[in-house]
Amino acid sequence: MKVAGVFLLLSLALLCFFSGAFSQGGQDKRGWITRSEGRFPGKGVLRHRLFQINCGEFRDPKVFCTRESDPLCGSDGQTYGNKCAFCKALEKSSGKINLKHRGKC
């Protein structure tokens, strides 16, 4: 049973690694914003965090943001109330803001 669990975890790790989940950051054509943080301190050691937000639904200027609270911290040190507010600020900044982490700054 332990061997099967180890094999499953190793398979999932390899799948994530080779599927492109560890991108360098930026915005792709589907509207997904990726922000990766971390360093590669040595061979075989990987410390990496990946944040993704889908801003595709907020690109329309006719869409207004609600007041729901789900704070996001931007790379500019600003706390945005929710995903919509962050995406609107990202659009206004021409992509210069990145997602630092979820929660208040």
Curated annotation (Swiss-Prot):
The modification Pyrrolidone carboxylic acid is found at Q24. Expressed in the upper epidermis and in skin appendages. It is found in: Secreted. The keyword Secreted applies. GO terms for molecular function: serine-type endopeptidase inhibitor activity. Residues 1-23 form the signal peptide. Its main location: secreted. GO terms for cellular component: extracellular region. Residues 49-105 form the Kazal-like domain. Induction: Release of soluble SPINK6 is down-regulated by TNF-alpha. IFN-gamma and retinoic acid. Expression is reduced after mechanical and metabolic injury to the skin barrier. The record marks R67, E68 as: Reactive bond. Pfam families: Kazal_1 (PF00050). Disulfide bonds join C55-C87, C65-C84, C73-C105. Keywords: Disulfide bond, Protease inhibitor, Pyrrolidone carboxylic acid, Secreted, Serine protease inhibitor, Signal. Serine protease inhibitor selective for kallikreins. Efficiently inhibits KLK5 and human KLK2, KLK4, KLK5, KLK6, KLK7, KLK12, KLK13 and KLK14. Doesn't inhibit human KLK1 and KLK8. This is Serine protease inhibitor Kazal-type 6. The gene is Spink6.
